[in-house]
Amino acid sequence: MFMIDWFYGVLASLGLWQKEAKILFLGLDNAGKTTLLHMLKDERLVQHQPTQHPTSEELSIGKIKFKAFDLGGHQIARRVWKDYYAKVDAVVYLVDAYDKERFAESKKELDALLSDESLASVPFLILGNKIDIPYAASEDELRYHLGLSNFTTGKGKVNLTDSNVRPLEVFMCSIVRKMGYGEGFKWVSQYIK
């Protein structure tokens, strides 16, 4: 039994075996967190009521098996976000790219997350959702309004091992059209240890 455990341990350390991760889905209410979670879980698009209580799902994407927590985005739900920061491997922060009036509020919440010491080394995938709606913000516009124009790390494979730079990138997506978020998850998965 020891040899088998050792062998699987070696495979896992080389990134050749399935990784496990805890991922938080955060963002303001109506950004698409629950819709994304259900799309990833069983590829179904359903109208959802606003999330009132934290929910979790176990999912697999590629070689990563992860437990995803949808914590809700309304003001009362945001108070419990901090309770879930322990041992988190990545944060997926969704922004409604069409609802430009709430960009300042979304920036405020994102800034609070990015400045929280317990999340200092956690990779952040920021998804600008609802790009299928006419007049939704462009990626550059969203970066500007979130104050991220000079703070993202690049969409390719960037070696950040020896730096104190947190992986952080913006990807635009449309959950209802099933586009964009796959590239984002592929990007963030390379930083999940």
UniProtKB/Swiss-Prot annotation:
Its main location: endoplasmic reticulum. The keyword Transmembrane does not apply. A motif (STAR) lies at residues 2-4. GTP binds at residues 30, 32-35, 129-130, 132, 175. It is an enzyme of class 3 (hydrolase). Disulfide bonds: none annotated. Mg(2+) binds at residues 29, 70. GO terms for cellular component: endoplasmic reticulum membrane; Golgi cisterna membrane; plasma membrane. It is a peripheral membrane protein. Gene3D superfamilies: P-loop containing nucleotide triphosphate hydrolases. Its EC number is 3.6.5.2. GO terms for molecular function: GTP binding; GTPase activity; metal ion binding. It holds the Pfam family Arf. It is found in: Endoplasmic reticulum membrane; Golgi apparatus, Golgi stack membrane; Cytoplasm, Cytosol. One of its GO terms (biological process) is intracellular protein transport. PROSITE patterns: SAR1 (PS51422). Small GTPases activation is mediated by guanine exchange factors (GEF), while inactivation through hydrolysis of the bound GTP is stimulated by GTPase activating proteins (GAP). Residues 10-14 are annotated as: Mediates recruitment to ER membranes. Keywords: Cytoplasm, Endoplasmic reticulum, ER-Golgi transport, Golgi apparatus, GTP-binding, Hydrolase, Magnesium, Membrane, Metal-binding, Nucleotide-binding, Protein transport, Transport. GDP binds at residues 30-35, 129-130, 132, 175. Small GTPase that cycles between an active GTP-bound and an inactive GDP-bound state and mainly functions in vesicle-mediated endoplasmic reticulum (ER) to Golgi transport. The active GTP-bound form inserts into the endoplasmic reticulum membrane where it recruits the remainder of the coat protein complex II/COPII. The coat protein complex II assembling and polymerizing on endoplasmic reticulum membrane is responsible for both the sorting of cargos and the deformation and budding of membranes into vesicles destined to the Golgi. Homodimer; upon association with membrane. Part of the coat protein complex II/COPII, composed of SEC23/24 and SEC13/31 heterodimers, that it helps recruit and assemble on endoplasmic reticulum (ER) membranes at ER exit sites. Belongs to the small GTPase superfamily. SAR1 family. This is Small COPII coat GTPase SAR1A. It comes from Arabidopsis thaliana (Mouse-ear cress). The lineage of its organism: Eukaryota, Viridiplantae, Streptophyta, Embryophyta, Tracheophyta. The gene is SAR1A.
